[in-house]
Design a protein with these regions (language model features):
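Interdomain hinge/linker elements that couple catalytic modules in large macromolecular machines
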Residues: 2-171, 175-177, 183
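Domain-level recognition of nuclease-like catalytic cores that cleave nucleotide substrates
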Residues: 4, 244-262
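Switch/connector loops and helix/strand junctions flanking conserved nucleotide-binding motifs
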Residues: 144, 218-220, 247-251
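Conserved catalytic cores of phosphodiester-cleaving nucleases, focusing on short active-site segments
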Residues: 168, 172, 196-215, 238
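Arginine/glycine-rich "motif VI" loop of SF2 helicases in the C-terminal RecA-like domain
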Residues: 177-178, 227-235
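Active-site metal-binding core of divalent-cation-utilizing nuclease and nuclease-like domains
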Residues: 182-196, 200-202
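Active-site-adjacent loop/helix micro-motif of nuclease/hydrolase catalytic cores
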Residues: 215-225
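Short, hydrophobic beta-strand segments that form beta-sheet elements in well-ordered domains
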Residues: 236-242
Length: 262
């Protein structure tokens, strides 16, 4: 498969389609080969040992004394996936100094636990948000840290859309990294509450992507795409990635399609 870029074409990937139930199971299980087809009990044991590995290998090496606080820190991060990362708020919730939280964030990022999606603010003015958005590299690990007991429960939690968005962003990111390509991924949000979940830069154009758990995509879901028009930015074709069983056009250059159609 090639690095994912919205092409404006209906027919795309060669992955077999999956139901929403199957999709939530994959998001809940995560993408580690050890748990992908395994039982909830074995999944629990695996993530427990994974956490232990992170702590022993990375945390102790960097001199973190309070391991339970670091676990709490990761759990707080997991509860905030898909949100703008606000260091002070996270530090306050964990009960540690802001500088400590900053150091721990750096460890979590360098260990490959989290991914920070940078904001886009090139030539758009001073009204855009300039904090990164927080994602976990594995949604299964995040769901485990949040103690979400099953795929069905995950599909019903208040922030299920954030878990779905996290999963989609990671799958798209992997399509670039596995092809040896440098991904130029951003998100857009301004103080007028306009938001574009993901912008992919292909070297000349920025391709806007909206991510929704809906199975019936509507044109109104992509109205924020117009935010980057009229600036010096060249906008490319876009996509709405969702749970729709069938791809369809939402405009002349925006296609709604499944995550399994990338």
């Amino acid at each position: 498969a090639k690095p994912y870029i919205p092409t404006g074409e209906l027919s795309r990937g060669s992955l077999s389609p999956k139901t929403p139930e199957e999709t939530w199971r994959i998001i809940w299980q995560g993408c580690w080969p050890e748990v992908a087809e395994d039982t909830p009990k074995n999944r629990n044991i695996f993530f427990q040992s994974l956490l232990q590995t992170y702590i022993e290998r990375d945390v102790i090496l960097t001199g973190i004394r309070n391991l339970s606080d670091f676990r709490k820190f990761l759990t707080v991060l997991a509860s905030r996936i898909g949100q703008e990362f606000q260091l002070n708020a996270v530090a306050a919730e964990v009960g540690v100094a802001t500088q400590t939280a900053k150091q721990w964030l750096s460890i979590a990022e360098s260990s490959g636990i989290i991914y920070l999606l940078p904001p886009f603010f090139e030539n758009v003015g001073k009204t855009v948000i300039k904090r990164p958005k927080l994602f976990f590299t594995d949604t299964g690990f995040a769901a485990w840290l949040c103690k979400i007991p099953s795929p069905e429960a995950l599909s019903k939690v208040y922030n299920n859309g954030s878990f779905f968005e996290n999963f989609v962003v990671m799958e798209l990111l992997k399509s670039w990294i596995h092809n040896g390509e440098e991904p130029y991924f951003y998100y857009y949000r301004d103080t007028r509450f306009n938001e574009i979940d993901l912008l992919i830069f292909d070297g000349t154009h920025y391709h806007p992507i909206e991510i929704k758990t809906s199975d019936s995509p509507q044109a109104g879901m992509i109205k924020a795409f117009d935010c980057i028009k009229g600036n010096t930015v060249k906008r490319g074709s876009g996509a709405l990635i969702c749970l729709t069983p069938k791809a369809r056009y939402l405009s002349s250059d925006v296609v709604a399609h499944s995550i399994w159609d990338i």
